[in-house]
Amino acid sequence: MALGSTAALAHDSHNEHAKVKPEIPTSLQYNFEYRMAKEKARDAFRHPKQTLKFFGVKPTDTVVEIWPGGGWYTQILAPALEGNGQYVAAHWPKDSSVGFFTKYRAKFDVKFTDHPERYGDISVTSFEPPKNTTLAPSESADVVLTFRNVHNWMSKNYEQTVFDSAFKALKPGGVLGVVEHRAKPGTKRLAMIESGYVTEDYVKQLAQNAGFEFAGASEINANPKDIKNYPAGVWTLPPTLRLKEQNKAKYLNIGESDRMTLKFVKPSK
């Protein structure tokens, strides 16, 4: 009887142990194994850990990144969300009429979606207004992020559409995080498009028009060395260095652009 009781106790203990689920971390856990040295070097200007902390990204979140390009942030976010959350890349369509878009979308797929063993189950949607305006299913995202894209949307005159799409994709209480090259206050629209620098006031207005509430700003990605007046706009600075060897040392010394880091919230119902 005692032996049977001991066996039963051991069996119950085993069942209880089997029911215990792995503890979900309360903050993002980073795996930089697959990042190249040149990508890590940009952390000094892009501050990914601090930026994502400011936006409040959690490991259980569904996070949509608009136009991730070559996937600099994908390498950081996708592994950190794997298993508990979901990374969604709202990328350029494979059939876009813009050659640059199709080229880099193909590169993204080869690097990321073809390697779930590294980056997990990445979800990719096609986003290119005015044809493709759905970032993700309505009210499915906890966080929508965009890094240095607003000036691109302005050049096509669909920046408001993008902010509206972000609002629709987010759950009530969800966060929109925007990082963008920061123009001097009062800069005119055409100058913003030509230079790549956008005013904070204009970004705030776009968000407000979409229905967002402003939730805070951070100077994490500020660069006081950036004078914002260059022959080839913001692309004069690294990492683009559009002027190539011309005054290269000067521009490398300035570093990457001065950037706003703004947080907006979709009001709860």
Predicted segments — roles?
Residues 133-144:
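A short acidic, Gly/Pro-enriched loop at the edge of an enzyme's catalytic core
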Residues 59-69:
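Conserved class I S-adenosyl-L-methionine
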Residues 101-133:
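S-adenosyl-L-methionine
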Residues 88-90, 173-181:
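Conserved beta-strand signature within the Rossmann-like core of class I S-adenosyl-L-methionine
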Residues 78-79, 159-172:
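A short glycine-rich, Lys/Arg-flanked "PGG" loop and its adjoining helix->strand segment in the class I
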Residues 24-59:
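Class I SAM-dependent methyltransferase Rossmann-like catalytic core
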Residues 227-269:
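Core SAM-dependent methyltransferase catalytic element
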Residues 129-130, 152-165:
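A short, conserved alpha-helix within the catalytic core of class I
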